[in-house]
Amino acid sequence: LSVFFIGFSFAANDTSSSISGSVNVPGATITVEHVPTGSTKSSAANDSGNFNFSGLRPGGPYVITASAAGFNTERVDNVYLTLAESNSFDVVLVSSTAIEDVVVTGVRSGISSSGPGSTITADDIALTASIDKGIGDFLKRDSRFAIQGTFRDVQISALGSNNRYNNFTIDGVAANDPLGLNANGFASVRNPISVETLAQIRVDFAPYSVTKGNFGGANINAVTKSGTNELEGKVYGYDTDQTNVGDVLGAPVNQFSDETKGFVVGGPIIEDKLFFFVGYEESERFSPSNSQPIAAEDEAELLQIKDFLMQRYNYDAGWPIFNAPPESQEQTLVKLDYSINDNHRVEYIYQDTQDINIREYDRPNLNYVFSSHYYVYPIDREKNTFAYIGDISDDLSVEMKYTDIVYKNDQDSLGGENFGHHRITLSSGEYAYPTSEQYLSLIHI
């Protein structure tokens, strides 16, 4: 089967935050400054004293100032914004002729939520213990999630629903399994995004927002980090193997090893204007084959089968004792943020995830599977996103996003694509599978 499809996205989940509130002086000037990048937005409160800022970067810190003629300027420091939520503040200005030692500050009145949900910040991720640095380890901070399995077998259930009922997005763009071939429901075999590159994860279970839909379990929106005026980064690595796993009911743990390493770096290209953020991560997991030892009475017949296929069809069937190469993944993220002016900014995000996994056809125990019966299960997902966030006027704000996604899954038998599937019964009654996988697909989406 060969399928080719290129996906374009024009609608997506929110990737920004907003600030709203009121001030006791209509017409007062409200200024919001994002300290890490130096970007600012200013607006005058309306006749009712209300103000609103949208399209802001999640996180912070922000500084909010309010000023008006004849009044002392008030300032609120260390404001941190929640992804896809409106953060509310009430500010009281005091006449400049009032007693000097009276101090009045802005008061945070709360967060206007779009429904039941939770937010996981980069600090939460850094402080949470995790075996495989998988998304599920951090989502289970919310008790409405149930997590089963690890690595590529992880299943994330929200409110008791099937894990495929979730909608998972990265920077507002869907990253779900388009074909239903991955047990985890993601568009990748392992983690769909390195958690070291995430700024916040927003989870919604029953939102009343037109921007959130296409799910029956949870809407999980992960937003990546951006560069700031500070050049900073880190190199990291972690690994585990069977010696770090406790016995389950006294049963031995099969041998395995899993290693992850990578780096992240971000900073300014042009101070206060243009910023970059780059992340790279590679993972490798190895588990020895569970091939059974070859019984003495079967070895001669297996060798005879191998020789026959080579002499008659020039087909190399391999051998039943086979250790597949390690399962591997490479992830690359490049993000550029450009502040055109105080009211307009654009983003470009490039993400590429490549998985390679060698699998064998499911079989009953006590059967011999030749190496030619294994197949390569590769996934390559490349995404380019262009976004515009701006204020057209005091009453109109716009967020536009265009995404191009190319998804490839070219499955290929190690024994080649032009030799059919066969099962051979040995004299001992056991089966031998010396030929290619019976299911094969070449998929481009």
What does each model-found stretch correspond to?
Residues F10-V103:
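Periplasm-facing N-terminal accessory domains of Gram-negative outer-membrane beta-barrel systems
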Residues E232, N254-I356, I379-V398:
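Transmembrane beta-barrel wall of Gram-negative outer-membrane proteins
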Residues P207, G237-T243, E282-F286, D352-I356, ...:
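Transmembrane beta-strands of outer-membrane beta-barrel pores
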Residues G134, D153, S188, L198, ...:
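Transmembrane beta-barrel architecture of outer-membrane proteins
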